[in-house]
Amino acid sequence: MSTVTKYFYKGENTDLIVFAASEELVDEYLKNPSIGKLSEVVELFEVFTPQDGRGAEGELGAASKAQVENEFGKGKKIEEVIDLILRNGKPNSTTSSLKTKGGNAGTKAYN
């Protein structure tokens, strides 16, 4: 099982999380960003949040469109949101699984 790095964005109203393949790949992407590179860095084009909306730990669920728009404004594409989280967030931890509320990551997240 491969490991992933959790990137944590401390939001004004809601904290948001994305999962990247590694810090090294994120650093490379940020030096010369492109959608092609982003797809190599982030396997799931989805945004998550803790159940209570705060912090980087605990059970994660899908971030709603409203939660994401409250943090970044309306009309942002998922690629733009993930880019902003990678740029303005911080690597929080490395994990070997993506367990979220309702099963594995990839269900019902903002995408």
Curated annotation (Swiss-Prot):
Q: Compositional bias (Polar residues) spans?
A: 90-99
The entry's localization annotation reads: Cytoplasm; Nucleus
Q: Provide a GO CC annotation, any one.
A: nucleus
Q: Where is this region: Disordered?
A: 89-111
Pfam families hit by this protein:
SBDS_N
Q: Which UniProt keywords apply?
A: Cytoplasm, Nucleus, Ribosome biogenesis, rRNA processing
The UniProt record lists the keyword Isomerase = no
Q: Where is the signal peptide?
A: none
Protein's GO biological process: rRNA processing
What task does this protein carry out?
Answer: May play a role in RNA metabolism, rRNA-processing, and in a process influencing telomere capping.
Q: What more does the entry say?
A: Present with 2430 molecules/cell in log phase SD medium.
Sequence similarity: Belongs to the SDO1-like family.
What is this protein's name?
A: Restriction of telomere capping protein 3
